[in-house]
């Protein structure tokens, strides 16, 4: 069974991640290693790649935009007075636009505004959106052939 894997390095930055669909973590990391021509140095932990399995969030509503499949990693920008760019606290969302991806995240996860945003002018749906960001990920696929050619999904 194939799974959605987000591949990242030791700094866990969601802006520097890759999306791969493979059946195992090792195979997903191998795809990125081959694509980026990464040579691992066993002494350097900073060049090591990690993978996190995701079940994508998506809208339950049907409509004209549901045929557009873009993958977004949605993450908090500022929680509790610190930047929180971290793959570990992110979600994979399928949506046509960044704004829609963030809305799906808010509706699915029950995201609350940061406690530091305590005045009424800082509360509400649009301020929740200000505390979140999303990066569009290009799905990396492996064509099943003898040479295992790696391709990227077009926009």
Curated annotation (Swiss-Prot):
Protein origin, superkingdom: Viruses
Its name, as the record gives it, is: Uncharacterized protein L110
**Annotated organism of origin:** Acanthamoeba polyphaga mimivirus
């Amino acid at each position: 069974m194939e799974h959605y894997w987000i591949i990242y390095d030791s700094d866990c930055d969601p802006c520097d991640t890759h999306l791969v669909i493979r059946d195992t973590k090792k195979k997903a990391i191998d795809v990125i290693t081959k694509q980026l021509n990464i040579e691992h140095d066993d002494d350097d932990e900073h060049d090591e790649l990690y993978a996190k399995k995701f079940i994508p969030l998506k809208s339950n509503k049907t409509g004209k935009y549901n045929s557009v499949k873009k993958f977004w990693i949605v993450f908090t920008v500022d929680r509790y007075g610190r930047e929180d760019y971290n793959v570990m606290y992110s979600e994979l969302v399928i949506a046509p636009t960044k704004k829609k991806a963030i809305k799906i995240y808010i509706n699915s996860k029950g995201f609350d505004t940061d406690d530091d945003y305590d005045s009424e002018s800082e509360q509400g749906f649009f301020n929740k959106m200000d505390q979140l960001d999303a990066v569009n990920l290009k799905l990396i696929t492996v064509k099943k052939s003898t040479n295992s050619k790696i391709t990227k999904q077009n926009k």
